[in-house]
Amino acid sequence: MNQAYIDAARTLQQCTFGGSQRDINDLVQSGSIENWVAQQTLIPSSSWLTHFEQDELNVPDLGQGLYYASSWTRMTVEGQDILRQRIAYTLSQLFVVSVKDPAFSAASKRRYMCQYFDGLLDNAFANFRDVIRFVSTSPIMGEYLTFVNNVSNELTAPDENYARELLQLFTLGPVKLRNNGEVRLDAEGNEVASYTQEDIEELARVFTGWKFIDIRGNDKYSQPMEPRGEHDMGEKRILGKKFPAGVSAVDELEAVIELLMNQNTLYTFVTKFFINKLVTSNPRAGYVRRVRRAFKRSDGDMQTLVIAILTDKDALRSGNTVGKLRDPLSVFTHAMRALQVKRRDGVMMWPKQFNWYNRTLPLSAPSVFYYYQPDDAPNHPDFNGLVAPEFNVYQWHDIYQYGIQFRELIARFEEETKDWYMDEALFTRYLAFDDEGVVDYLNEHLFAYQMSEQARQCYLDYLAQCPSRQSKWRKEIKNLVMNALLSPEFITQG
C-alpha cells in the first residue's frame, strides 16, 4: 500500500470521527494536509439542531431524549464536514456543559444543548478568543455555571463558578506551564499557580449583569445573553492587570478575553489539550513546544493549531508510548463511517438501537470536570509516568454496553428488512473465498493500515475454518467483524 494512503488513514483517525475510503482518497488527492484542511473549512457546517428538528418532524412524539441521540448519529455518520465536527467535539470536551445538570434535566431543553454544540461548530476554525466570547455569552453556559443574573453589591458577592472554571479548566489550568508543556517551578521547586483566589473574585465581578434575552419560557436559551442587569462598574485587578472603573459589561468582557489571550500559559494549555484529544495522551516536550509556537504566532487561530498538530513530525510517530485510547463515542462512530453504514430509503431517522447506551454521549458528562481529567491514569505499573485518561470510561459496565452497541450494529448487516445496511465489498470478498481481501478490507477501513501481523494471522486462521460460505456466511462474517470491533487494536490509536 502506498505510504501516502497509510498516513492519510492515520491522520483521519486522529482528526475526524473516522474516515471512509473516499475520505482517505480526498486527503491524498488534496496534495497536503494544509490543502485538505483549507478544503474542509469551506464545507458548510453541519447543525445538530437542524437534524434534531428534522427527526422531531419526521417521527413525532418519540421524546426529545431519543431525538437528541438519533440526530447526533445522523450528523456524525452522514455529515461531510468531518474535520469541523471533530474539532467542535474537542472544544465541547474543554468547555463542558451537560444535560445531566439539574437545570437541564427537562427533555424539552435538549434542543438548546444541540444549539450550543452548533456554536462550537461555527467557531471550530475561528480564533480561540471567538470561542471564549461565544462560551462566555452562551445562555447554556450561563445557566450551567450559574453566572446568569449574577449581581454584585456590598451585601452579596457575585457567583464565582464561571470565573473559576474559565481560569482553571477552560484557558489556563491551575498551574503555569512552560512552552513545552512541563509545569513551571519556582526557585524552591514549587509549582507556580496560574491565578489566585483574589483573581477569581475579581473576575467574577466582570461577569455581573448578564441576563437571558427578554423572552419567556425555554426560548430564552436560543440567543446569547445580554448585559441588561446591574453590572459591577468598579475598578478591578485581574492577573496583575488593572481594569478601570466605569467600563461596560461588553467592553470589560472583551478586555478579559484579551487579557487571557496574552497569557503565555493559555497557548501551552490549549495546545496540549488538543494534542491529547486528537493524537497522543503523552506527547513529547518538543511536540508541544513546536505546535504551541505556531498557535501563539497565529495569535490563537484554530486552523493554524489543527494544521500544526497534524503536520508535526511526531503526529505519525510510532512506539509503545505514543497514541491514545479512544473514547467509545469516537470508536463507534468510526466503525459506522468506515463500514459505510447507511439508512435505507424511506427510513426517516436512525433507530433506537443507536441511543448511545454508553455514558459518553456529547454534552452529557457528570460534571464540569468531564468524564476524566487529563492526568488520569490506570493504577498499574505499566503506566508509571504516563497518562491514559480515557480508561476511566471503560469500566466493566461501559465495556458491556459498548459490546451491545456493536452487536446491534452488525446484527443488521445485509438483512433486507432492517433499517440500515453497510458496504457490500466485505461480503463480496468473503463469498469469493478471498480471505486476504477480507482482512485487507478490515485493515484499510477499521485499523488505518495499522493491523499487527499477529491480528492479521488470527483473522486468516478464523476464515480458514469457515468452509461453508453460503449457508452460514452471515453468522461467520458477523463474528469476524465483531471480533475486529472489540479488539484492543481497534479501540486504541497508534
Task: Show where each model-derived region lies.
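Active-site substrate-binding loop specific to GH73 endo-beta-N-acetylglucosaminidase modules
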Residues: 24-29, 38-43, 49-56, 61, ...
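Short, contiguous, well-structured surface segments enriched in hydrophobic/aromatic residues
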Residues: 81-84, 95-101
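Flexible, low-complexity segments enriched for small/polar residues
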Residues: 2-3, 9-16, 57, 95, ...
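Tryptophan-centered motif/residue detector
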Residues: 71-74, 162, 210, 365, ...
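Amphipathic interfacial helices
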Residues: 67-68, 78-86
